Curated annotation (Swiss-Prot):
Participates actively in the response to hyperosmotic and heat shock by preventing the aggregation of stress-denatured proteins, in association with DnaK and GrpE. It is the nucleotide exchange factor for DnaK and may function as a thermosensor. Unfolded proteins bind initially to DnaJ; upon interaction with the DnaJ-bound protein, DnaK hydrolyzes its bound ATP, resulting in the formation of a stable complex. GrpE releases ADP from DnaK; ATP binding to DnaK triggers the release of the substrate protein, thus completing the reaction cycle. Residues 1-13 have a biased composition (Polar residues). It comes from the Bacteria. Its main location: cytoplasm. Residues 1-34 are annotated as: Disordered. This is Protein GrpE. Residues 19-34 have a biased composition (Low complexity). It holds the Pfam family GrpE.
């Protein structure tokens, strides 16, 4: 009968040899895995840095936009006020005039009124003077209805001008409207 058992020393040497071969085969795979891991970690770090930069840039843009809006609100009236200053100068000059000449005062008031109207127009404030137009409840406020020759609901008289700034009614015109016949 043959000895089916191998010598433990021989078996151990074979195991060591095959383990070395396996280790040698695994070493390049482990190195490749380590390299891939290092590359992935570097990519993650790069992406995190890019994310943080983008987040900081977004915050800076948002903050700058808020500052711009705040400044726009704060100084929106600046241009309008600049257009009103000549009107103020004219009124102050009239207040210190002691000549007593009514014709001069009237002429000064008319000039000042033109200056004021011009300043308002530069600020996009325009008068609503709707005589002869159809009554519009968005721009007019009817004070009374009177019998008139015009069509019903037509503005007959303006008691107080209205004003619009851009497309928004600042103050509706107070009007008298023709009543139905």
């Amino acid at each position: 009968m043959e000895n089916t058992q191998e010598n433990p020393a021989t078996q151990s040497a074979e195991d060591i040899g095959s383990a070395k071969q396996a280790a040698q085969g695994a070493a390049p795979a482990a190195e490749a895995a380590d390299a891939a891991l290092a590359e992935a970690q570097a990519k993650v770090a790069e992406l995190q840095e890019s994310y943080l930069r983008a987040k900081a840039e977004t915050e800076n843009v948002r903050r700058r936009a808020q500052d711009d809006v705040s400044k726009a609100h704060k100084f929106a009236i600046e241009s309008f006020a600049e257009h009103l200053l000549p009107v103020l100068d004219s009124l102050e000059a009239a207040a210190v005039d002691t000549s007593g000449d009514i014709a001069k005062v009237r002429e000064g008031v008319e000039l000042t009124l033109r200056q004021l109207t011009s300043a308002l127009e530069k600020g996009r404030v325009v008068a609503i003077n709707p005589v002869g137009e159809k009554f519009d409840p968005h721009q007019h406020q009817a004070i009374s209805m009177v019998p008139a020759e015009q069509e019903p609901n037509t503005v007959v008289a303006v008691l107080q001008k209205g004003y619009m700034i851009a497309d928004r009614v600042l103050r509706p015109a107070l009007v008298t409207v023709a009543q139905p016949k």
